[in-house]
Structures are given as structure tokens and as C-alpha cells.
Amino acid sequence: MERIARSLLVLFFIVFSCLSAQAVEQPTYKNTVMVPQTVQLGQCVKTFNVNFEKLFFLTETAINSNNYNIEEIQSKGGYIVFSVAQYKFLATVYTFGPGNAILKITPCNNIYTFPPMIITNVYRYIEQNQYKKF
């Protein structure tokens, strides 16, 4: 009986020694969602198959639903100024042929090092809702 208990204790010790060593060896990965990265201008421009007015409203709704702070809106000019943390962006909507419009989201300070998920979240929201009726 004592021999079985000792064997189980040794086995228990070996298993926990291996698990703790394995946990130390695993590298820790940084969350890259909100890490600033250099973004190309091509990633900031996207064409949608909706008209100017609908894309403008979808952009405003996307910014609002992502809890970004809207600082200025001009519907006639087709632009929205919004901020996320310390980053400030200009979202501009352009007409591009019949039934098409372009959305361009650029940083206001013209420094293209920011978390790319900020603009990706806006584009993703618009893509998911562009065919819904208002």
C-alpha cells in the first residue's frame, strides 16, 4: 500500500513538473488588434455598391455603433470627423458612378501609423448592412 502511494506521489510530481516547464516555454503573443501599425493608403479607401446618401448614413451608423466619438459631421460635403483614443480620423464619402460610392478614412494628422482595426471595423459594419433597407 505504501509503495503504491509513493509511486502515485512520484507520478504526480513528474506530471506537474512537466506541465509547469511546458507553460514557461510557450511564447506569449501580443494582442495585435489595437497595436499601431503602418497602414497603406490603399487600405483606407473602399468602394461600395450603394449610393452616396446611403453610404454616408451607413458610415455614420458604423462609427456610432463602434463607440467612436463623432466630433464633426457635414452631410453636404460628405465627411465625418471622429476620434478613437488619441487617434483622429476623417471619413469622406465620394460619388463614383451611378449607384456606387467610395469611402475614404484617413488620419487627420496624416500619420498612417495607427491600429488598422479602427477602419476595418467601420468597413466590416458597412459590408454587413449595405443591403438592408432603411
Protein language model regions, located:
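Bacterial N-terminal signal peptides that target proteins for export
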Residues: 1-9
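Bacterial N-terminal signal peptides
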Residues: 8-18
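Ser/Thr-rich, low-complexity intrinsically disordered terminal regions
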Residues: 22-134
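Short, intrinsically disordered, low-complexity terminal segments
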Residues: 2, 18-21
